[in-house]
Structure formats: structure tokens, C-alpha cells
Amino acid sequence: MNTYSTSLPRAVFGVAAGVMTGSVLVMLWSFVGMTQVDEHWLRHALSVFRFAAGVWAAGLILLASVPWALLHYYGLRGWPIAIVLGVVLTFVVVFGFLTNGFGAYSAQYDVSIADSGGPTWVRGRLTPHGWFEAFQFAAICSAVGAVVALAVWRVAYRRETGEATGRS
């Protein structure tokens, strides 16, 4: 079985690689459905990239660092574990955000919202269609989370050599 190790500088570079990967993917995703490129496309791309970089940095540093450190401590350091962590954390965070804390909080205002599939919010509460839309979007975002986690893992970890016996 392969064992992997890392160091603080490699972990920092791994987080930076994850921020860049996630931001580029979100920026590219923002162009899906565009039929033509106008004169503001570069400004739009840079704005989306900057915002996404802030979100990914906050998520990787504030949310993912503790579970990642625990998994590392217990020797769960392979790329499949990293991908599972990226998928689960991204899905939970996005789904919780889109559903106002998994339905724990109602909207502050008596608001109703609909999309082409029907109402998603009615009087400040999510409809079944709204829950399904949130689930779908969170699932798509979790795929991006998997790619980000793989990028972090690939930059941060290296196979241990035969002489290395201690935990790092």
C-alpha cells in the first residue's frame, strides 16, 4: 500500500492550486450558454474569477483544513479519500446555502420565486421543486469540488520513500 507525506509548504501550494483550479472552473462555467462574446467578456471573467477565488480560499482554509488534517493524521491520504472529502464538503456547503440551512430558517421576507420548472420558493419556504433544484446545483458543484480536491492532493502529497517511517 502506498503511503503519502506532505510538508507545510507543499500543503500551502496545494491550497493555492485548489483555489486556482476552482476559480478557473467557475469562471469557465460562467460562460456556459453564452451565444456571443461581447466587449465586456474579459471584465466579466476576471470578476467571476476574483469572487470564486475568495470563496474557494475561504472554503479550503476555513472548512476543509480540519477534516483534511484529521484524515491525514489517521493515515487516510490517498487521492480517492481527497475526492470523497471534496465532493461531500462541497455538496453539504452548497446545498445548505441554497436551502437556508437545510430548511432550518425561512426567508426573512414573504417571498415567492419561480423558474421555468415551477415555483421554487413560496411564502419564504422551499417547494419540492426548489429542493430538487438545490440538490441538482449542489451535485454539479460537488463535481467541481472533486476536481479541486484532486488538485490540492496532487500538489500537496508525495509518496513516502522506504526510509520514512514517522508520520509527517
Give the positions of each predicted feature:
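Juxtamembrane/disordered regions of integral membrane proteins
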Residues: M1-S168
